[in-house]
Protein backbone atom coordinates (compact mmCIF):
# COMPACT_ATOMS: atom_id res chain seq x y z
CA UNK A 1 0.00 0.00 0.00
CA UNK A 2 1.18 3.50 -0.80
CA UNK A 3 0.45 6.68 1.16
CA UNK A 4 -1.17 9.12 -1.24
CA UNK A 5 0.22 12.68 -1.68
CA UNK A 6 -1.48 16.07 -1.70
CA UNK A 7 -1.87 16.22 -5.51
CA UNK A 8 -3.74 12.87 -5.52
CA UNK A 9 -5.99 13.95 -2.63
CA UNK A 10 -6.73 17.28 -4.36
CA UNK A 11 -7.56 15.58 -7.67
CA UNK A 12 -9.92 13.05 -6.03
CA UNK A 13 -11.59 15.74 -3.92
CA UNK A 14 -12.06 18.27 -6.72
CA UNK A 15 -12.98 15.86 -9.54
CA UNK A 16 -14.71 12.98 -7.72
CA UNK A 17 -16.13 14.57 -4.54
CA UNK A 18 -13.97 12.46 -2.21
CA UNK A 19 -14.02 15.26 0.42
CA UNK A 20 -16.78 17.91 0.58
CA UNK A 21 -16.34 20.71 1.43
CA UNK A 22 -12.66 20.56 0.50
CA UNK A 23 -10.02 23.05 1.69
CA UNK A 24 -7.16 22.78 -0.84
CA UNK A 25 -4.52 24.32 1.45
CA UNK A 26 -3.47 24.14 5.09
CA UNK A 27 -5.31 26.78 7.13
CA UNK A 28 -3.61 27.47 10.45
CA UNK A 29 -3.60 31.18 11.32
CA UNK A 30 -5.17 31.51 14.78
CA UNK A 31 -6.87 28.10 14.56
CA UNK A 32 -6.06 24.45 15.04
CA UNK A 33 -4.93 23.62 11.51
CA UNK A 34 -7.17 22.01 8.91
CA UNK A 35 -7.19 21.31 5.18
CA UNK A 36 -4.83 19.65 2.73
CA UNK A 37 -1.38 18.64 3.95
CA UNK A 38 1.54 16.91 2.22
CA UNK A 39 0.27 13.35 2.75
CA UNK A 40 -3.14 13.72 4.34
CA UNK A 41 -6.15 15.87 5.04
CA UNK A 42 -6.86 17.54 8.38
CA UNK A 43 -10.63 17.44 8.88
CA UNK A 44 -12.67 19.86 10.97
CA UNK A 45 -15.04 19.02 13.80
CA UNK A 46 -18.66 20.17 13.42
CA UNK A 47 -20.39 22.28 16.09
CA UNK A 48 -22.78 19.56 17.31
CA UNK A 49 -21.57 17.44 20.23
CA UNK A 50 -22.85 14.58 22.38
CA UNK A 51 -21.28 14.83 25.82
CA UNK A 52 -21.33 11.79 28.12
CA UNK A 53 -23.23 12.40 31.35
CA UNK A 54 -24.19 10.31 34.36
CA UNK A 55 -27.30 12.36 35.10
CA UNK A 56 -29.57 9.44 34.13
CA UNK A 57 -27.36 6.70 35.64
CA UNK A 58 -27.20 5.00 32.24
CA UNK A 59 -24.94 2.04 31.59
CA UNK A 60 -22.79 2.18 28.46
CA UNK A 61 -23.66 -0.93 26.45
CA UNK A 62 -22.51 -1.07 22.80
CA UNK A 63 -25.23 -3.67 22.00
CA UNK A 64 -28.03 -1.66 23.58
CA UNK A 65 -26.88 1.93 23.53
CA UNK A 66 -29.04 4.45 25.35
CA UNK A 67 -29.45 7.99 24.00
CA UNK A 68 -29.75 9.25 27.59
CA UNK A 69 -26.03 8.59 28.10
CA UNK A 70 -25.42 12.00 26.51
CA UNK A 71 -26.49 15.58 26.54
CA UNK A 72 -26.61 17.30 23.16
CA UNK A 73 -24.84 20.61 22.72
CA UNK A 74 -24.52 22.89 19.69
CA UNK A 75 -21.65 25.29 20.32
CA UNK A 76 -18.45 26.77 18.92
CA UNK A 77 -16.47 25.52 21.94
CA UNK A 78 -17.30 22.20 23.60
CA UNK A 79 -16.09 21.66 27.17
CA UNK A 80 -15.29 18.01 27.86
CA UNK A 81 -15.54 17.21 31.58
CA UNK A 82 -12.46 15.70 33.27
CA UNK A 83 -11.84 12.04 32.36
CA UNK A 84 -14.87 12.10 30.07
CA UNK A 85 -15.82 11.56 26.47
CA UNK A 86 -17.57 13.40 23.64
CA UNK A 87 -18.90 12.36 20.24
CA UNK A 88 -18.89 14.75 17.30
CA UNK A 89 -18.63 14.51 13.52
CA UNK A 90 -16.56 15.99 10.75
CA UNK A 91 -17.67 19.05 8.82
CA UNK A 92 -16.46 17.19 5.73
CA UNK A 93 -18.37 14.40 3.97
CA UNK A 94 -16.08 11.64 2.65
CA UNK A 95 -16.49 9.26 -0.32
CA UNK A 96 -13.77 6.62 -0.21
CA UNK A 97 -12.65 4.98 -3.50
CA UNK A 98 -12.82 1.17 -3.77
CA UNK A 99 -9.03 0.79 -3.79
CA UNK A 100 -8.34 3.07 -0.80
CA UNK A 101 -8.29 2.56 2.97
CA UNK A 102 -8.16 5.66 5.17
CA UNK A 103 -6.68 5.77 8.64
CA UNK A 104 -7.02 8.61 11.11
CA UNK A 105 -4.48 10.04 13.51
CA UNK A 106 -4.97 12.69 16.17
CA UNK A 107 -3.77 16.28 16.13
CA UNK A 108 -0.59 16.96 18.08
CA UNK A 109 -2.08 20.18 19.47
CA UNK A 110 -4.90 18.24 21.15
CA UNK A 111 -2.73 15.27 22.16
CA UNK A 112 -0.34 17.60 24.01
CA UNK A 113 -3.34 18.74 26.06
CA UNK A 114 -4.43 15.19 26.93
CA UNK A 115 -7.25 15.14 24.35
CA UNK A 116 -7.26 12.00 22.25
CA UNK A 117 -9.35 11.53 19.10
CA UNK A 118 -10.22 8.05 17.90
CA UNK A 119 -11.65 7.06 14.56
CA UNK A 120 -11.72 3.57 13.08
CA UNK A 121 -10.54 3.13 9.46
CA UNK A 122 -12.69 4.42 6.61
CA UNK A 123 -13.24 1.34 4.49
CA UNK A 124 -13.09 1.16 0.68
CA UNK A 125 -16.47 2.22 -0.73
CA UNK A 126 -17.63 3.89 2.50
CA UNK A 127 -19.15 7.36 2.49
CA UNK A 128 -20.52 9.75 5.08
CA UNK A 129 -19.64 12.21 7.80
CA UNK A 130 -17.08 10.65 10.12
CA UNK A 131 -18.14 10.24 13.75
CA UNK A 132 -15.28 11.45 15.95
CA UNK A 133 -14.63 10.19 19.48
CA UNK A 134 -12.79 12.62 21.78
CA UNK A 135 -11.44 11.51 25.17
CA UNK A 136 -10.29 13.98 27.80
CA UNK A 137 -7.63 12.02 29.68
CA UNK A 138 -6.88 14.86 32.10
CA UNK A 139 -8.32 15.64 35.56
CA UNK A 140 -9.30 19.09 34.20
CA UNK A 141 -12.04 20.29 31.81
CA UNK A 142 -10.81 20.50 28.20
CA UNK A 143 -11.96 22.45 25.12
CA UNK A 144 -12.70 21.28 21.59
CA UNK A 145 -13.07 24.03 18.98
CA UNK A 146 -15.78 23.60 16.34
CA UNK A 147 -14.90 24.29 12.70
CA UNK A 148 -11.19 23.81 13.40
CA UNK A 149 -8.87 20.85 12.83
CA UNK A 150 -9.68 17.66 14.75
CA UNK A 151 -7.65 14.88 13.16
CA UNK A 152 -5.68 13.92 10.06
CA UNK A 153 -6.84 11.35 7.52
CA UNK A 154 -4.13 9.41 5.67
CA UNK A 155 -5.11 7.74 2.38
CA UNK A 156 -3.59 4.33 1.61
CA UNK A 157 -3.97 3.03 -1.94
CA UNK A 158 -4.19 -0.72 -2.46
CA UNK A 159 -2.56 -2.48 -5.40
CA UNK A 160 -6.02 -3.25 -6.79
CA UNK A 161 -9.68 -2.79 -5.95
CA UNK A 162 -11.13 -4.97 -3.20
CA UNK A 163 -13.58 -7.74 -4.13
CA UNK A 164 -16.24 -6.42 -1.75
CA UNK A 165 -16.41 -2.82 -0.60
CA UNK A 166 -18.14 -1.44 2.49
CA UNK A 167 -20.99 -0.36 0.20
CA UNK A 168 -21.23 -3.85 -1.36
CA UNK A 169 -21.51 -5.36 2.14
CA UNK A 170 -24.25 -2.87 3.08
CA UNK A 171 -22.18 -1.67 6.04
CA UNK A 172 -24.24 -0.34 8.94
CA UNK A 173 -22.51 3.05 9.05
CA UNK A 174 -22.86 3.73 5.29
CA UNK A 175 -24.09 7.23 4.34
CA UNK A 176 -24.11 8.48 7.94
CA UNK A 177 -24.87 12.16 8.47
CA UNK A 178 -23.81 13.96 11.62
CA UNK A 179 -23.09 12.00 14.79
CA UNK A 180 -23.98 8.31 14.56
CA UNK A 181 -24.30 6.29 17.76
CA UNK A 182 -23.14 2.64 18.05
CA UNK A 183 -25.16 0.13 16.01
CA UNK A 184 -25.18 -3.64 16.43
CA UNK A 185 -27.28 -5.41 13.80
Curated annotation (Swiss-Prot):
GO BP, one annotated term: dUTP biosynthetic process
CDD domains in the cross-refs: trimeric_dUTPase
Sorted UniProt keywords: Hydrolase, Nucleotide metabolism, Nucleotide-binding
GO molecular function terms attached to this record: dCTP deaminase activity; nucleotide binding
Active site location: 133
Binding site for dCTP: 107-112, 131-133, 152, 166, 176
Keyword Nucleus: no
Gene3D superfamilies: 2.70.40.10
Disulfide-bonded cysteines: none
Protein family: Belongs to the dCTP deaminase family.
Record text on subunit structure and interactions: Homotrimer.
Protein name in UniProt: dCTP deaminase
Lineage: Bacteria, Pseudomonadati, Pseudomonadota, Alphaproteobacteria, Rickettsiales
